Amino acid sequence: MKCESTDLEIETLISRIKNGDIDLQPDFQRGEIWTVQKKQKLIDSILRGWKIPPIHVIHNSHAIDEVLDGQQRLAAIRDFFDNIICIDGDIQPEDSIISTLNGLHYRDLSKEWQRRFRQYSIVVIRLTECRPEEPAELFYRLNQPMALTSAEQRNAYIGVTRE
């Protein structure tokens, strides 16, 4: 299996999804399960400029990229772009600028914020020349839960909560 990594802007990903060049629902994928709150946290991360995990796609024989890992993230991005979900400006840690965007949909954002969202880059890893068992094994490895210990959870917080 070959893995090629590239950075794609959200506007390119949205265009490819809408054109059918990226398939969010290949046969092996589960349905969309993220809550609105989880989708809003992802959008918040993007608006803050924080990096999110890469998207993994399988390039199939029909020249379509089937999403192996990242379906929920891409669906959340699409839903925000399509004005289905809005920004939650109360997500912690507080950000005085993002809090002013509370309740806004993509269409309500200033041109500058829309541009920042559209031009945010996400790493996309395209898998080619896969043996039949390889994508499923990679998916399993990428999605193995690794629970944090109580100490690790405490250390992840800053400020009063951590003391």
Where do the PLM segments sit?
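Basic- and aromatic-enriched surface patches that contact anionic nucleotides/nucleic acids
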Residues: 1-12, 26-36, 40-163
